[in-house]
Amino acid sequence: MSRLIIVFIVVSMICSATALPSKKIIDEDEKDEKRSVAVAGAIIKGAALTFNVLQTVLKALGDISRKIAVGVDNESGKTWTALNTYFRSGTSDIVLPHKVPHGKALLYNGQKDRGPVATGAVGVLAYAMSDGNTLAVLFSVPYDYNWYSNWWNVRIFKGRRRADQRMYEQLYYYLSPFRGDNGWHERHLGYGLKSRGFMNSGGQAILEIHVTKA
């Protein structure tokens, strides 16, 4: 009888030890889900990217006259890895989300420089795609609407390229950007991909882009 009791105790201890890692994995998954909220710098499910989510990101920036919330949905079948952000005007306190798997969307923001300065929020995001090429996203929210308008663009560059002044000029001046006109625009990007995006026309802007298989 005593041997049976000992065997029972040993088996119970083994089962308990086996259950602990599983619980830890579940806890980590729950933490990841909690991190996937509507804040700049987060990665969320692609299907969850909506105007309401971007408005939440925008609101978190506070009372700033020139600001933007950016959401880019990855339905490309590829994984994206952040390279950098180049700001032509303005800034952001957010680190560009590092990894964006297929089926997920990144959230980011930008704003005018702090203080009484006449600047907008203008920049380019660059992501290395798992096929070896670079996805680039332009956003432009100007300070002076007497002379300028909102503009955006999304393009794929061959090979690996970091965002810089030259990339900004290509996207803004030469590669047919879209005006932020409160409407949706579509474009074939090449490499078997296409895009669909929306940007509003105001100084507190949202930019929603979906990159999908063509």
From Swiss-Prot:
GO annotation terms (biological process): cytolysis in another organism; monoatomic cation transport; pore complex assembly
GO MF: channel activity; toxin activity
Record flagged with keyword Transmembrane: yes
Family annotation (Pfam families): Anemone_cytotox (PF06369)
Propeptide feature: residues: 20-35
Signal peptide residue numbers: 1-19
Region (Plays an important role in the hemolytic activity): 38-47
Secreted among keywords: yes
Subcellular location: Secreted; Nematocyst; Target cell membrane
Span list, region Trp-rich region, which is important for the binding to lipid membrane: 140-155
GO CC aspect terms: extracellular region; nematocyst; other organism cell membrane; pore complex
Positions of the UniProt region annotated as N-terminal region: 46-65
Marked site positions, Interacts with the lipid membrane: 179, 195
Binding site for phosphocholine: 89, 122, 140, 142, 168, 172-173
Residues under site feature: Important in the initial contact with the lipid membrane: 147-148
Span of the annotated motif Cell attachment site, crucial for protein stability: 179-181
This protein's UniProt keywords: Cleavage on pair of basic residues, Cytolysis, Ion transport, Membrane, Nematocyst, Secreted, Signal, Target cell membrane, Target membrane, Toxin, Transmembrane, Transport
Domain notes: Composed of a long N-terminal alpha-helix and a core region rich in beta-sheet structures. Before the pore formation, the alpha-helix binds the lipid membrane, partitions into the lipid-water interface and stabilizes the monomeric molecule on the membrane. Finally, it traverses the bilayer, thus forming the transmembrane pore.
Family membership noted in the UniProt record: Belongs to the actinoporin family. Sea anemone subfamily.
Function noted in UniProt: Pore-forming protein that forms cations-selective hydrophilic pores of around 1 nm and causes cytolysis. Pore formation is a multi-step process that involves specific recognition of membrane sphingomyelin (but neither cholesterol nor phosphatidylcholine) using aromatic rich region and adjacent phosphocholine (POC) binding site, firm binding to the membrane (mainly driven by hydrophobic interactions) accompanied by the transfer of the N-terminal region to the lipid-water interface and finally pore formation after oligomerization of monomers.
Assembly and oligomerization: Octamer or nonamer in membranes. Monomer in the soluble state.
Protein name: DELTA-actitoxin-Aeq1c
